Amino acid sequence: ESGCFLVEGRKMVEEALASAFDVETVLVQEGMELPDGLTMPVYELPAHVLAAVCDTKTPQGIAAVVRMKEQSALGKHIVVLDGVQDPGNVGTILRTADAFDCDGVFLVNACADLYNPKTARATMGAIFRREAYSVTVEELFSLLQKSGVPLYGTALRDDTVPLAEANLARAAVAIGSEGRGLSQQVLDECAKTLKIPMNPRC
């Protein structure tokens, strides 16, 4: 509701400071060394007060309040998460999307909160390097249609093709939830579905 989220630990704070995100406030444990060149308000807090604010059991003595970014234009390579509920999974997929240089990640259908502290930690800083947004399914479909980006799903059906045979020069690839896979609503909008061929012994 505030339009802000909390990140914890020196690495995440430094990633936030180096990014295009606006860092509203830095919270630091009394006696801790501060990063150089801070221009935003900095509050020194007793260790027990900072620990109460943070999500981790053993905070690293520094945290930051960061403003969420407004949505930018859609890129050519998009990952869609459809109902992925575990914050660690959402964060890991965002980190993987960053490793593959994807343009953005869109979350639909009650995914884990993008700005949950567990999600943010699992991204290992990728949340500050990749565009990532929670949107409604209708908003996603509208964005893809306006941008001319086809939607592909990771599921098995009659038109499923091996990943290596798909033209992904311009594409959004949807990944379903841990328990049920892709929702029918998203599956119905997929131009094709993709599979990764596996060794029969697997």
Short names for language-model regions:
Residues 33-40, 71-74, 184-188:
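Short loop/helix-cap segments at secondary-structure boundaries that form the rim of catalytic
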Residues 57-62, 66-73:
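Acidic/glycine-rich phosphate/pyrophosphate-binding loops and surrounding catalytic core
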Residues 45-46, 82, 108-109, 131, ...:
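Short beta->alpha connector loops at strand-helix junctions that form conserved
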Residues 1-55:
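N-terminal positively charged helical leader segments and presequences
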